[in-house]
Amino acid sequence: MKNKYSLLLLVTSFGIISCQEKVEPIENEKTVVEDNVIVYEEYMGDEPTAPEETEFYEPKVAVVKPGSIGAAPSDAIVLFNGTNLDNWISSNDSTAAKWHLNKDASMTVNDKTGNIQTKQNFGDVQLHIEWKSPLPVQLEGQHRANSGIFLNGMYEVQVLDQNDNPTYVNGQVGSIYKQHVPLAMASVPTGEWNTYEIIYHAPEFNADGGKIKSGDITVIHNGVLVQDHVELKGTTPYIGWPKNPAHGKGPLLLQDHGDDSRVSFRNIWVREL
């Protein structure tokens, strides 16, 4: 009997780390639904009577060394560490990213220069990103320190200065824009650094471009669960319904909202899942 566990979750003070090494699926492990009741074939037959019969030692679980608080783990792809914007390009024309590089190892939206995105494309990922809304506070509602983090370049986790700033709840900080209201508003005071830990699984499409499996996303905002494995019903447009264009891997995109948002980002890394 083989080990049925293919995922190890390491809980750290700054996020969730899962082993990158994928384990081959177990051929004889199946779930059967009979009359709307789930039955696990692997647990049918004679039940074990000794503890050793349900203890497994293979396959070995990959070792990932977590970083210190604020640092990337050993198998992460570091997308921004504050030294340059080499991993990023303009979403408008694929030229060099034009956002401001700051002395504190952060970058800030350069108003009206356009969104930026990673040169590398990704599918399923664990994403760590830190962001800050600026002082002094200016404007209100959706115009106050508005940005967004787009998985696959099309599914937005909202970034917004929500402190004493009411707006529509499916567009507030921590929302999956216009799809899922966050479970809590967990922002730190304006001018301090927020952390997002995002677990994203991309949708799947058949050969004809039809969606056969929805994507899903989990978001932890400053240690607080705000999106719990929610279904991505499609893209996250400002106007209209979600759309489901067939796609493969895509970039991570950061939004220039075009209204002097002055949002800053730092310490961005991903782990491919």
Residue ranges and their predicted role:
Residues 1-27:
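Bacterial Sec-dependent N-terminal signal peptides
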